[in-house]
Amino acid sequence: MIIWFAVVGVVLTWAVFQSPALDYRLVALGAVLPVTESPWGAGFLHTLLAPTLVLLVIMLVTTGRRLVRRRWLGLPIGMYLHLVLDGAWMWTETFWWPVLDRSFTPGSAPEFSRGWWSLVLDVAGVAVGVWAWRRFGLDDPERRSRFLRTGQLDRTFVTGGRG
């Protein structure tokens, strides 16, 4: 579950935004954050409201600080991607909370309701991860160190060139 959300979330974000200033580590963190509540069922982090509130706070706190904002936007982007990659909209009472329902429906979170499909998704996540490792040149120690230190991918890879 975690590999699927973290890796595919980062790759999808890169494919859409291709931003050199975005912290892709925060995208991965945002994408796996809702999994932390999964043992107790789908709760607040599986709602559309959670990433929207995080986005609002980031927009307010980073007013006038464009680069700081761009870096931190990875967190709500990852949280939104979790909802997409999880199919969270199919649990409408939770997804639209508190609009459709004032309480969370008891039961398992989407991550635990798939059974073996969760393993299949993680294997797919590993395959995407191998592709991304090569595509972003993370076998190069300098590029890998930069990614681990700053969360940024090498500019030549982000803008479509091969370094």
Language model: regions and residue ranges:
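N-terminal membrane-targeting hydrophobic helices
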Residues: 1-163
